[in-house]
């Protein structure tokens, strides 16, 4: 996940095949450090500079006006709506990831609804990825309930091309065995699976990252 040009460069140098832009607002497309281009050309410029596919996150939740603001605070241009998905596709986005940032409050039912809507609208133009890296503020969907086999099957039926799930060892209660079951389900249904790190292990030491990578491989 990257938010500025330096992070884009680091991801490419580390071997990334896909650049995922977190908190990218389709109404206000900004990537700090990018050469000056028209807003609608922002994604195309990233692709030109890197030669990589570009993904963005869209979150199926409402914008809250409770006065609390943080880097994760949802904006209209980051919501998982058909209008925003069409804007993203027009900008050149290759993949839309339907998920939730920390504390936003995205549940799996909302992901399913948004996935079905976006699949109908732009499913033939972009890769649709669905799932969660963590509970996203939904306590009833923690541990193995972050993503169950039933959730996975529902996402796939709604049009997911890629199933997103936490990497084993990154969130409490999400084991290698559970990940393996979900990955098997995805592959049997003819879609891809993507294990992810969306928690504090992003800044962990090399040995920890190596262990997580091996668990993902075994799953």
Locate the predicted segments by residue.
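C-terminal functional extensions of proteins
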Residues: 217-219
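Conserved mixed alpha/beta catalytic, RNA-binding, or beta-rich assembly cores of soluble enzyme
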Residues: 1-44, 49-215
